[in-house]
Amino acid sequence: KNSGHYGLSGYYAEQAVKKNLITMIFTNAPPAVAPHGALKSLFGTNPICFGTPTNSKIPFILDTSISMINRGKIRVAAREGTKIPEGVALDKYGKPTTDPKKALEGVQLPIAGFRGSGLAWMVDILSGVFTGGNHAGRVKDPFENFTGPQNIGHLFITMKANLFSSDYNRRIKDNIKTVKKLPKIKGIKEIHYPGQNKFYRFKKNENKEIHISKKVEEDLENLKWVYQ
């Protein structure tokens, strides 16, 4: 509790996996997602992360949120004047919108309807109610409210991978191999497990330049003069 935005959940999962630990991570966030059936946002995008060793150099890291789209992507779209995908947000009147500015004024939609709403609620309980942090819409938005700390709650659960089975490494390897051997739909060369694509992208791009849009470049240039 008494925390703020802690960055990427997957980073912490990677540290646990390096020590041969299975990990589950939950954190709540400022209001962005409306509970199923509500017109007002209350839950955050509330990331959920799971990590496990795989007996290979590529760990299994599932790092996702319960919303249809990351809130940061909506902010980027609003700043750059682009649209967001259909079916991810409602405006303040409860109507579907692809306008990022209207989406920020309205609500984001959870994944899988009422199921995603239930997951968001679960994360709010685990990381907010259980830890003693803010919950039920009380987490402050750092972009809009500077009156005090966010008091976000995080919950980290770690377990030894071989806690119940001494041959976990063999079993997880067999599990992944079984999934990867399934018949594939047309155009799919390999079935990837969570974290695999990220690993490949990182290796491909780790020595390349980072390209940013002209608008972001201008914003950074303006900040330089503000804080120098």
Question: Residues of each region from the PLM?
Answer:
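Phosphate/diphosphate-binding glycine-rich loops and adjacent basic-rich segments that engage nucleotide
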Residues: 33-101
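Glycine-rich beta-alpha junction loops
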Residues: 66-69, 115, 161-163
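A glycine-rich, acidic short-motif signal
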Residues: 1-58
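Glycine-rich phosphate/pyrophosphate-binding loops
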Residues: 20-35, 126-142
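Catalytic-core signal marking the mid-to-C-terminal active-site face
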Residues: 130, 135-228
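Short coil/turn connectors at secondary-structure junctions
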Residues: 18-22, 44-47, 55-59, 83-86, ...
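Small-residue-enriched flexible segments
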Residues: 71-132, 149
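Predominant activation on well-ordered alpha-helical scaffold segments within soluble catalytic domains
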Residues: 14-17, 51, 87, 119-127, ...
